[in-house]
Amino acid sequence: MTKKKVKPNSNTIALNKRARHDYFIEDEIEAGLELQGWEVKSIRAGKANISDSYVIFKNGEAFLFGASIQPLNVASTHIVCDPTRTRKLLLNKRELASLFGKANRDGFTIVALSLYWKSAWAKVKIGLAKGKKQQDKRDDIKEREWKVTKDRIMKNAHRRS
């Protein structure tokens, strides 16, 4: 018998699949997160959710709002754990200025796309997004269905020949 191949560990902690469904993603940027100790432990245990999170600007700094990190039962008991705390994003001044300028245009917002490990650091991928209308979502679904149908037709055509 052959040995099963071991899959490499994925570095992705949490994905925001809804963001790509609800928004056109214009630009993507990687940012660091300022976390507390109990948050790092919880993220390592996979208790993070970024489905409704977005970026706000306050006093020239960027903050991740709406991300939920559930505390572990074994985490530190002398610290009050707030799962939905606003977390500071670690970005260069140039990146901050660029994002702030782009996000102030009409119809644009900045949403969290994914949370992942990069070596020992937790990083969040944020995207400059513009909201989709209902018709745009329908067009995406039609396009996806046509691609599946086309692949099926091509597969059957290759089998016959």
UniProtKB/Swiss-Prot annotation:
Keyword match Thylakoid: no
Regions that span the bilayer: none
PROSITE patterns linked to this entry: SSRP
Positions in coiled-coil regions: none
Highest taxon of source: Bacteria
Keywords: Cytoplasm, RNA-binding
Principal location listed in the UniProt entry: cytoplasm
Keyword presence, Magnesium: no
SUPFAM superfamilies, sorted: Small protein B (SmpB) (SSF74982)
One GO CC term, this protein: cytosol
Subcellular localization: Cytoplasm
Any one GO molecular function term: RNA binding
UniProt-listed InterPro entries: SmpB, SsrA-bd_prot, SsrA-bd_prot_CS
Gene Ontology terms: biological process: trans-translation
HAMAP family reported in the protein's UniProt record: SmpB
Protein's job: Required for rescue of stalled ribosomes mediated by trans-translation. Binds to transfer-messenger RNA (tmRNA), required for stable association of tmRNA with ribosomes. tmRNA and SmpB together mimic tRNA shape, replacing the anticodon stem-loop with SmpB. tmRNA is encoded by the ssrA gene; the 2 termini fold to resemble tRNA(Ala) and it encodes a 'tag peptide', a short internal open reading frame. During trans-translation Ala-aminoacylated tmRNA acts like a tRNA, entering the A-site of stalled ribosomes, displacing the stalled mRNA.
Family: Belongs to the SmpB family.
NCBIfam families: PRK05422.1, smpB
Protein's recorded name: SsrA-binding protein
Annotated organism of origin: Haemophilus influenzae (strain PittGG)
